[in-house]
């Protein structure tokens, strides 16, 4: 497999993770995530020890949804965690975990920084997703873009500065709020994936720096 193929494969994982944070799982998405091809993907991903526990939780939750009521319960989890904005939620915005302010504002410094990254790449947050640019789903989608369109050093810098600096705090808060455990598993898998990419990119960047 060429490096281009590897980068595209990794980009697909970031796109998947982005989609899970961008919107709730509906009936069509559930079919995609539990299809034969998806089962093979989850099985392959679970072979990596750092991913196994998270992937097993994601798979068991998705495969266990057998009726509309169970699907609605998962959708309610998404809404309660990411859309409501109460003490029982875990808003997926970098600014809430990086700002030193007691009550950080949305559309603040991290949003502006992420908007500039998007602008430099001639991208923008789509109108059907009216969220600040430092929403985790946006950042993951941008990371997928970088894996297909940028050098290793750019990928590494973005992972280190824009993900590694706050994801652990987000996961700690999310775990306290997410009783079902599905989205905690998705977030934990995201951090493990980011850390693996950083570990793989650092030696490659060091060789040419």
From Swiss-Prot:
Its main location: cytoplasm. GO terms for cellular component: cytoplasm. The keyword RNA-binding does not apply. Coiled coil: none annotated. GO terms for biological process: protein complex oligomerization; protein folding. SUPFAM superfamilies: TorD-like (SSF89155). It comes from Shewanella massilia. It comes from the Bacteria. Involved in the biogenesis of TorA. Acts on TorA before the insertion of the molybdenum cofactor and, as a result, probably favors a conformation of the apoenzyme that is competent for acquiring the cofactor. Keywords: Chaperone, Cytoplasm. HAMAP family: TorD. InterPro entries: Chaperone_TorD, DMSO/NO3_reduct_chaperone, HscB_C_sf, TorD-like_sf, TorD/DmsD_chaperones. Pfam families: Nitrate_red_del (PF02613). It is found in: Cytoplasm. The gene is torD. Gene3D superfamilies: 1.20.120.1820, HscB, C-terminal domain. NCBIfam families: PRK04976.1 (NF003442). Belongs to the TorD/DmsD family. TorD subfamily. This is Chaperone protein TorD.
